[in-house]
Curated annotation (Swiss-Prot):
Organism name: Mus musculus (Mouse)
GO cellular component, one term: plasma membrane raft
Protein name: Myelin and lymphocyte protein
Main location, first listed in the record: membrane
Expression (tissue specificity): Expressed in the spinal cord, brain, kidney and gastrointestinal tract especially in the stomach and caecum. Highly expressed by myelinating glial cells.
Transmembrane stretches, start-end: 25-46, 54-75, 93-114, 126-147
Amino acid sequence: MAPAAASGGSTLPSGFSVFTTFPDLLFVCEFVFGGLVWILIASSLVPLPLAQGWVMFVSVFCFVATTSLMILYIIGTHGGETSWITLDAAYHCVAALFYLSASVLEALATISMFDGFTYKHYHENIAAVVFAYVVTLIYVVHAVFSLIRWKSS
């Protein structure tokens, strides 16, 4: 299968085809798992405020930006312009890098919590680390296929 066909073509979908074309259906996974990271970080204790502050910023920023892009694609704001394909690829590359840095920092904060915190708080942070890495992987996959779409446009 050609790269353009594997990535859903060289144009962005509009309407509810956002939920049926790859890689754009990954918006839903980014939304769900990114929201879980946000909730888990917000509900946990903060042993390293600076590190977890960055994780919180990344999760909220990416949640809002992903939701905004998804809504803009559904209502067809892009109008088939190639500049939106560039925006899509750039956003997902930046989001993947941000989430990778946030995942590493959250893992560091969780490791530092091992002694002196309850298991409940420790397990919340472990879940946040796992979901942060899952979201990182989803953003990387979306970025790769967005770059393929960008190159073929």
